[in-house]
Amino acid sequence: MGCSLNKLEKREEKRPGNIYSTLKRPQVETKVDVTYEYCFLEFTTLTAAELPRSSATRLASLRDLPDQLLELYQQGFSLAALHPFVQPTRRQEKILLEHIFRAILVKKTNRSQKAELHDEGYTLELDYCSSLEHLADQKLIPEFIKKVQEAASQGLKFVSVVPQYQPSVSSAGSRRLKPVANSVEDARDVKCTLGDRSSLENDTPKAAETDAATAGVNRRPETKPGSTGDVPSAQQPGIPSPSAENEAGEFPLRGLQPALDRSEGDPSNGPEELPSRKMEIFAFFNRPKSQQKCRQYYPVTIPLQVSKNGQTVSSLDASWLEHMSDHFRKGGVLVNAVFQLGMANDSFYGLTDGVFIFEAVSTEDNRTTQGYDAIVVEQWTVLEGTEVQTDYMPLLNSLAAYGWQLTCVLPTPILKTTREGNVSTKQIVFLQRPCLPQKTKKRESKFQWRFSRNEIHGRQTRKSKGKLSASNKQQAEENEKNLEDQFSKAGDVGNCVLGAPQWGRASEVREQRQGSAAVQNGPAGHNRDSVALRHSNPRAEAELAAGPTPTEAN
């Protein structure tokens, strides 16, 4: 009572783990002819002394990645995205997660043929763009786009760009790597914003709060292609409860202390000791083995809203689909995204420009241009030490069955530390799929929606059959009546021959054609024509009265 506590932010406003899409969920889960298969490789450029107890594959440099992925390329996979777990920044102190990378590979399959598509194989190539020192960030982008377009003119397909700052070198020649947090104050600086002492519960998703479509995200894939060492079993992400976070006790942090230079003191004095910083830019391309076409790439600048607490980034937000949907509808494919925080203001809220690189529609394919639908996922990746416990791979595998292709993963410099020592970082995942064919709808009457199209067609068919059967029945009766009239007229015309009269039973009528005359066997009918015939031939009447001749009797 009497305590003036700050109001907690609404979870709907700052709740991570959100999914944004141009479609509704039933349309997102509509199966198409194409499916995808994903696998990934986690690797690091740090040595075992710098990063002990890690299952990540160790590479001497990013230049060794094409050789490392050669076996997967021979199996039909190709690189789809490449990113560090944490976005590198211009800070002098570097953290371990900036030097741990993930490469996601994809293989396309055809659902209808139940066979893999091998129409276009690739080889992975790397281009070392530049090693820049004290160059403004906004000047890097035009130079990089020019490099990408030059490679595209040679038939290469751009995949990803990885900017990497070289680690700081001390006077003893060893690299100094800053842990995520080495004190209670550092942990609070990472997780608390100015004037807000709320817990990580407001910024870290729980399984019960996220959308149903992200329910599978909090599961770790069982296999890790290309990884070395034993991977510890997956556990719960370790996201603390509100009571645990609000306790005023100490934060026992573990798992991310560097192995070297632990006695050099607080690394926050780095800017004075090491004013010189270099950044290396590596660009990765897929070269098609068979057909090579010239691709066009263009940049799109999107404003990103950054919240900072001192030099620590606490949040990063943007209206993703608002700025990208128009490019998706016109057939643009997102390939990669880069941004630097040097353009952001030093105030609490600042804006920085994110540069998103799109592949334009080829001029050769203008006649078959089709738009794309998109999904954007704001995903929190949780790590225990350096081992991933929660990430986007389960969600990616579930969407692969519906033909969604991963195009880009944008890491952020956001880091939050929990009481258990786990670290969570925010990553933005982009997926695309060709638009579903639009069904043409006919204008129907007001109440036609009660019946399906098949039921309406069946009712119309039965109705037409009923009308047809009634008309056929009437026509058959008329034909039968006309036929009886024709028989009656044919029996009254011609010569009549009487055999032995048998009046006690019905006579048998047979029609026999001899030339053009009609002969009727049996008793002739009593009509006016037959009477007129008897009176007009008296000789025939006399013969009939005399009876049959002997010759006829025989």
From Swiss-Prot:
UniProt modified residues of type Phosphoserine: 183, 199, 507, 530
Summary of the knockout phenotype: Mutant mice have smaller spleen, fewer splenocytes, reduced IgM production and secrete less IFNG, during antigen re-stimulation. Double RFTN1 and RFTN2 mutant mice show no visible phenotype under pathogen-free conditions but show greatly reduced IFNB1 production in splenic dendritic cells following poly(I:C) or LPS stimulation.
GO BP terms, alphabetized: B cell receptor signaling pathway; dsRNA transport; membrane raft assembly; positive regulation of growth rate; positive regulation of interleukin-17 production; protein localization to membrane raft; protein transport into membrane raft; response to exogenous dsRNA
Keyword terms: Cell membrane, Cytoplasm, Endosome, Lipoprotein, Membrane, Myristate, Palmitate, Phosphoprotein
This protein's record includes keyword Cell membrane: yes
InterPro entries cross-referenced by the UniProt entry: Raftlin
Gene Ontology, cellular component aspect: cytoplasm; early endosome; endosome; membrane raft; plasma membrane; protein-containing complex
Composition bias type Basic and acidic residues, residue spans: 198-209, 475-487, 526-542
Expression tissues: Expressed in T-cells, B-cells, thymus and spleen (at protein level). Expressed in dendritic cells, macrophages, heart, lung and small intestine.
Positions where lipid (S-palmitoyl cysteine) attaches: 3
Gene Ontology MF term list: double-stranded RNA binding
Record region (Disordered): 192-249, 441-488, 504-554
Keyword Cell membrane found: yes
Sites of N-myristoyl glycine lipidation: 2
Mode of membrane association: Lipid-anchor
Compartments reported by the entry: Cell membrane; Cytoplasm; Membrane raft; Endosome
Function in brief: Involved in protein trafficking via association with clathrin and AP2 complex. Upon bacterial lipopolysaccharide stimulation, mediates internalization of TLR4 to endosomes in dendritic cells and macrophages, and internalization of poly(I:C) to TLR3-positive endosomes in myeloid dendritic cells and epithelial cells; resulting in activation of TICAM1-mediated signaling and subsequent IFNB1 production. Involved in T-cell antigen receptor-mediated signaling by regulating tyrosine kinase LCK localization, T-cell dependent antibody production and cytokine secretion.
Quaternary assembly: Interacts with TLR4; the interaction occurs in response to lipopolysaccharide stimulation. Interacts with CLTC; the interaction occurs in response to pathogens. Interacts with AP2A1 and AP2B1.
Family the entry assigns: Belongs to the raftlin family.
Protein name as it appears in the record: Raftlin
Organism taxonomic ancestry: Eukaryota, Metazoa, Chordata, Craniata, Vertebrata
